[in-house]
């Protein structure tokens, strides 16, 4: 059986040798060049391939059409990936009739993603293992061919556990590879409900937070000790690295980080205490804990902790245009919860942000972006991160006011983009799930999916193409003029303060607000084309947390990226959304304030939106970028979001009804 192998690390060497022992005809080996900045403690796949007289390559982008064509010419029967660090495209995987199989360092579906050995230790797991699974478009999500369990002892470190995993991989492959040559193995689908995902770790993640328990801190030490950079803390400005430690079940009344004794060197934790067995000063030697205390002048009752800043760091200034909107006001709330940020905002109203007006870190001006261009340019120059959230984003307006959509959504925002280029400011731009249009992929991928829209006479696509063109302009400015940017694409975010009932009364609102208005007024719920269209609904709090991490942009991880923000597990049709709303409405404590339910009414899209409308059957995001780059995973179930959104609007409607007579008297 002819095989193509993608491999790196010790596990890659194990996989390559196992294939050779099993008699596979290895056509080519793809690996990575060594990173001079990485502490390489593992064997070289390139050397093993050379010893086996196999052709070996290390392309920068194996998914490039030139490499895809070279692999096609080799006509592989099967593809294997052993700790190869890049995802393989569907095009490459389709070249092998038997498919592609990846060896992952955990018991899937748990610990999908990066650095599973480190993560299981950080989280104090007692068992892990290796999994051989079929590769699919979603990382580490394909059906399982086999697994081999590995016990984790209390004294295991990342290095000792790696050795166990290497042996486990060898045993698993010796068992499976000969059988796979005979024919396809039975595969077991993964249970998505049990899946967990973890992203890459950096050296900065090794910083110790002493308020955690001694058990938790010791797990961190085990997870990142040699050959990794190590767990660390500070004594004033001086860094110390802890290589080995022991948790102590010790009762104390000291603040976390306080040194309880120097021989042995013992530090108070939020729960228990940590004995430092070996460690190292920033420019010192690897020594025992008591010797470390002597060398660094550590004495009893001194506190270890974060490195104190020499200067008072200025808050990051975030400019939000459209700050009173749905995303704008929720994002403002999240930013103001963190004292690293201050917010400058512009909008034509302030009802949703009135709760922030007394906050000294919030600066608001009422105005229109079409008029206040000088104010906007000045504040782009003044601020650090720019979010132009002003747009017409309600479907009925795409056909009712297409030119206004273009003028505001494209022309006005293009001015802002150019000012960001002029003053070298980072822009976080709200693209949209609408740019994917009628894409026929099962999941819409930021980097590979085609953006497909309808004919010119379907004016509803003017919003989609306006946003898409801005995406392309921003990308070009990034490539040609160094603009720092991130494009984020929300997928049907919903929650309290989404639109308002007045907007729904004139049809200018999103679906859930329109449905709630029907319930509040006792009018039939209109289901456009029967409400069969499916969407993936995302809770505003999940969405805002992802957006906050984009603004935070740790280590520049979001620069030049496009990131979908949605919840694929919350997929439902508009009819299902309406039925869920109706159930919550009938059970709500304010139900008696509103008329009886008037039923569902199916209506054609042309009658509701106009002749220029065209809909899509589904819109499902791939969120691999958000998981990998932001370490983000949506958590809030659709039912909770529906309940909270409905409650917000019902209470607002009751207040509106009770206030109406008073208003009439005053008139």
UniProtKB/Swiss-Prot annotation:
Residues 1-304 are annotated as: Formyltransferase ArnAFT. One of its GO terms (molecular function) is carboxy-lyase activity. The active site is at 104 (proton donor), 434 (proton acceptor), 619 (proton donor). Pathway: Nucleotide-sugar biosynthesis; UDP-4-deoxy-4-formamido-beta-L-arabinose biosynthesis; UDP-4-deoxy-4-formamido-beta-L-arabinose from UDP-alpha-D-glucuronate: step 1/3; Nucleotide-sugar biosynthesis; UDP-4-deoxy-4-formamido-beta-L-arabinose biosynthesis; UDP-4-deoxy-4-formamido-beta-L-arabinose from UDP-alpha-D-glucuronate: step 3/3; Bacterial outer membrane biogenesis; lipopolysaccharide biosynthesis. The record marks 140 as: Raises pKa of active site His. GO terms for biological process: lipid A biosynthetic process; lipopolysaccharide biosynthetic process; response to antibiotic. It comes from the Bacteria. Its EC number is 2.1.2.13, 1.1.1.305. Keywords: Antibiotic resistance, Lipid A biosynthesis, Lipid biosynthesis, Lipid metabolism, Lipopolysaccharide biosynthesis, Multifunctional enzyme, NAD, Oxidoreductase, Transferase. GO terms for cellular component: membrane. HAMAP family: ArnA. This is Bifunctional polymyxin resistance protein ArnA. It comes from Yersinia pestis.
